[in-house]
Amino acid sequence: METKLMSFRDTIILAMSEEMRRDENVLLMGEDVGVFGGDFGTSVGMLEEFGPERVRDCPISEAAISGAAAGAAMTGLCPIVDMTFMDFSVIAMDNIVNQAAKTRYMFGGKGQVPITIRCAAGNGVGSAAQHSQSLESWFTHIPGLKVVAPGTPADMKGLLKSSIRDNNPVIILEYKSEFNQKGEVPVDPDYTIPLGVGEIKREGTDVTVVTYGKMLRRVMQAAEELAEEGISVEVVDPRTLVPLDKEIIINSVKKTGKVVLVNDAHKTSGFIGEISAIISESEAFDYLDAPIRRCAGEDVPMPYAQNLENAMIPTVESIKEAIRKTHNKQ
């Protein structure tokens, strides 16, 4: 498969542009998506190609944007919403949770709401407490929503395109600190990744680490460094949180007998707690040789100071230490 080295940012532009060329019903809407090219540069050049009818600059009202998008989706269009910071999605919760997520069910499966809501999540760029949250577990709790958290540029392309083509509302996380990170991306305009299919990012035999999104790069580095210590780490990336590929997680835990769960979101009620419950309630529980361990963000608001911000979420070193303790059955 032919690939090209691309950043997350350029991959997002490519995936949206390919889908807008494929389907004239697809449009992009949000604050500053047109003339400015997106707050994070994720729609640069799209206004020039597709025009203001399909790349729509909107007023600063997330409630209005999400409501207009939900209505457009219900009447045959396929809107992509740039919510900019994920923190701002809370202003749009009624339209996302009570309208978009419930419509198909309340109309007996006859109503479709093909809306993709792109959210810039996580810390790492000095955006402080109101612009640095990872709120995926808020949305995984809501039946009717799909939630996607790509950890590589290739996965971003395949999963974003599948999200746009899906006839249900999808929340997709784009981690701000990763926009400039690069990886090989398939150039095929028909390249997609099915929602609900995870991937083993690294084979191992001693400890399973389940992670997604922003933390994948750090976990992969930790696994590589621990290999020099003789610890073989298997890295499982579910890629999609809802629907979740439970089988790939359970099978890996059965293989290694030990598991560490890593995310950057706050530890309390974070999504990795749900993964822990799934493992505990499955046949994998009988294979465990050590307690399930979580490595997650601290339960405090995100500081602005860089040194404090860096201390807020798992580092390569803290991930390595969690894996070591689990490997040693501590």
Tell me what each language-model feature is.
Residues M1-P169, L173, K176-Q330:
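Thiamine diphosphate
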